Amino acid sequence: MEDFVRQCFNPMIVELAEKAMKEYGEDLKIETNKFAAICTHLEVCFMYSDFHFINEQGESIVVELDDPNALLKHRFEIIEGRDRTMAWTVVNSICNTTGAEKPKFLPDLYDYKENRFIEIGVTRREVHIYYLEKANKIKSENTHIHIFSFTGEEMATKADYTLDEESRARIKTRLFTIRQEMANRGLWDSFRQSERGEETIEEKFEISGTMRRLADQSLPPNFSCLENFRAYVDGFEPNGCIEGKLSQMSKEVNAKIEPFLKTTPRPIKLPNGPPCYQRSKFLLMDALKLSIEDPSHEGEGIPLYDAIKCIRTFFGWKEPYIVKPHEKGINSNYLLSWKQVLAELQDIETEEKIPRTKNMKKTSQLKWALGENMAPEKVDFDNCRDISDLKQYDSDEPELRSLSSWIQNEFNKACELTDSIWIELDEIGEDVAPIEYIASMRRNYFTAEVSHCRATEYIMKGVYINTALLNASCAAMDDFQLIPMISKCRTKEGRRKTNLYGFIIKGRSHLRNDTDVVNFVSMEFSLTDPRLEPHKWEKYCVLEIGDMLLRSAIGQMSRPMFLYVRTNGTSKIKMKWGMEMRRCLLQSLQQIESMIEAESSVKEKDMTKEFFENKSEAWPIGESPKGVEEGSIGKVCRTLLAKSVFNSLYASPQLEGFSAESRKLLLVVQALRDNLEPGTFDLGGLYEAIEECLINDPWVLLNASWFNSFLTHALK
């Protein structure tokens, strides 16, 4: 491309482009497409000005041959191509002599006939898209915009094209020639795509057939076809009175647009009340694993066999007792349920052959814990038609809960590294195309950053538990099946490891609809004393079941081992999504990929390697009361993954609503930061919609608190 530019353009233009790139610290050897774009833009600016003069009568004339007798003044002052200091000097001088308003950005030309600055654009995309980008950036009614494309299209402010047709045709022909020359050398595709930094398949996307008819049918009133509507939108003056424009569009609209300033937004109000409680389906940072390394026992891989093998590694069992009761439950039933599990596991061990699955005896404590016979009787609606006061039973409003520090601790823990590897590198065969090579490289770098992450452990744990529970719900509908909570990983040395977190006992599960609920009792090992944060464990009955010897720097120490027991429930659709938690890896990888793409687009080459290997660079991770938190690229990967995993673990209607509504406020704040002068109407209604979602969910409350930190720092 560099050779082509030096052959194709006048040496003076090439020299000016080199200077411009040097001034902005850009390397023309690397950013060759940018080099070509600057040369093209300079040439169009010079061609725009060439041969245009103002005669003694003040008329604009075109003179192609030098006539030394004519007293002619150049019609256009060329600003583009000068160094910044000189360019601003020229602009200031013009403003002082003509009284023109000083522009915010350096324009390309000044037209002495029309007394206006001109911004010239040369685009490889649709002219109207580029025009809108320019208009949004400049935000000035005094600077005239004129856009040319390589396909012969053009667009100008108020369709005022300034020059005569022949002069414009000369510019279009030159652009078309540059395009042809590039295409002949195989440079055009790369040049065209580099403007937006992503691949586009069609140069011009024409709508035809059914889609075209639908487009014409779905236009607002008073527009006969899509072209008319496009022209109206392109000519829409954004600085006009928006209220007036709105009322033109529809008689029903009556909106008062208020300017959105730095002082406009207020913090989101978080609810007051007792602290929020843990509501995930399994323990996260508080979970304890009983593990076996290099499992090679008989029946290895069969969950019940693995569980019994893990249970045998622990010798500190003791008579269980309740240390933190569940306030509303019959706690003795939870205690009896655990004793029953231990007893039935011991019974299995005395059998000659361990069964593949274990169904628990339907004791009174398990029937109570699993809500057996507690569901109200269903009656066919036709049999109730004659009952005059038939109504849905009243349900209490949920109690408001306040944010508690434990959920931030949970999130921080999810971002940390463990000493185990939770996902393997998938081998997908040899790469064929270059894009596959880049994709594999990105996947491998990303996997290396997150394979040890605790959030990845939660993914594998969630996938296992949900898969096992859904299988059991379908295969043993009437049974109280015992399901071990298991995960598998590798140690740093590469040895296989099987972990047992505890057990689930499933209730009756005749799941016809996606939302039908299956009840289960979870019993999970932990070293966390529930009395330290009793509000977190509101839904749990916690037993002390043993003492565990732990090795530390100062020798061995004994810690009490707890069992967190609770009744819970889930549905087919929730289990289906739980089984697909690996998608969180994909979502966070795509977010990282878009960061790499943005970087690659600026540098005009793939930046994957530099992105992951430049360990010194700090990236923004998130907002906290202290300000913008920064960290390594690995930390960014793990934080994005943890957010995605928590969205899955704490999925709820409150989260859906908060995400959708707070996003609107976020976009307005970002527009303000980008100096786009946003306006809003019914901002109070938006706040109401956001705050309506803040009820009792810990993850939503934490996100709202983060959002407030963002508002504080974004509007400083």
Swiss-Prot record:
Segments carrying motif Nuclear localization signal 2 (NLS2): 184-247
Residues reported in the UniProt entry to bind Mn(2+) 2: E80, D108
Keyword annotations from UniProtKB, A to Z: Cap snatching, Endonuclease, Eukaryotic host gene expression shutoff by virus, Eukaryotic host transcription shutoff by virus, Host cytoplasm, Host gene expression shutoff by virus, Host nucleus, Host-virus interaction, Hydrolase, Inhibition of host RNA polymerase II by virus, Manganese, Metal-binding, Nuclease, Phosphoprotein
Regions crossing the membrane: none
Renumbered ranges of motif Nuclear localization signal 1 (NLS1): 124-139
GO CC, any one term: host cell nucleus
Annotated Mn(2+) 1 binding sites: H41, D108, E119, I120
UniProt-annotated location(s): Host cytoplasm; Host nucleus
Bridged cysteine pairs (disulfide): none
Quaternary data: Influenza RNA polymerase is composed of three subunits: PB1, PB2 and PA. Interacts (via C-terminus) with PB1 (via N-terminus).
Protein purpose: Plays an essential role in viral RNA transcription and replication by forming the heterotrimeric polymerase complex together with PB1 and PB2 subunits. The complex transcribes viral mRNAs by using a unique mechanism called cap-snatching. It consists in the hijacking and cleavage of host capped pre-mRNAs. These short capped RNAs are then used as primers for viral mRNAs. The PB2 subunit is responsible for the binding of the 5' cap of cellular pre-mRNAs which are subsequently cleaved after 10-13 nucleotides by the PA subunit that carries the endonuclease activity.
Name of the protein described by the UniProt record: Polymerase acidic protein
Gene: PA
